[in-house]
């Protein structure tokens, strides 16, 4: 088996920042177990598999492809940064001639369009609903101790718990916060929660680049202690902060050690555009 494989840093214009994803281009069907084996070998938060939908398709000329995402532990239903990385590989390395690519995925058809300053992902919007604190108190306290919480929301579509920290906290607090993810899967083992999102409101002003909100994302339930930059969580962070701030266009920053920037646009048709850059840092051949 020889497969072309790449690593691209997503949601950044600088190598070794953003979120790295492996991208594997499949000329033909891959054995089902091989997807997970490769993802485990790559040992990144996500490995994407881009496949031709028809035998006559071509990675340079075609505009529709199948796309699946795997963490080192399991297949995942939606991944923004690995979708961005996949589009970047097709645009930059396979010189795809189309301005917009369509990916057929577990979460429906997702589009990625090329712009001068990045790639725009066309994703669904996922609503969040108020979550009773007492139902998740043990989980939250295990993760962040006595850190003050302002709001808690739950997304049944993505199984993410969104925890907004007090507005008294800023970016530096979120960046330095020690989050204990190790006990979380044992505390919440019903399958209701697969991801924990912490978020704070952005600054009202200042000399540095402004962001409307900041976040960090943790998914130990699927083998990812902290995800560096998570495009898919902005399908719920976007609408949440849009309602809170009264804005449709926002700029977001994910405060992991690597960090990453995302431009968010809530569209009238109920979908969200998520734009970011991508840098391909590795190209090779999987030979196993």
Curated annotation (Swiss-Prot):
GO terms for biological process: biosynthetic process. InterPro entries: Phenazine_PhzF-like (IPR003719). The keyword Isomerase applies. GO terms for molecular function: isomerase activity. Pfam families: PhzC-PhzF. Belongs to the PhzF family. This is Phenazine biosynthesis-like domain-containing protein 2. It comes from Mus musculus (Mouse).
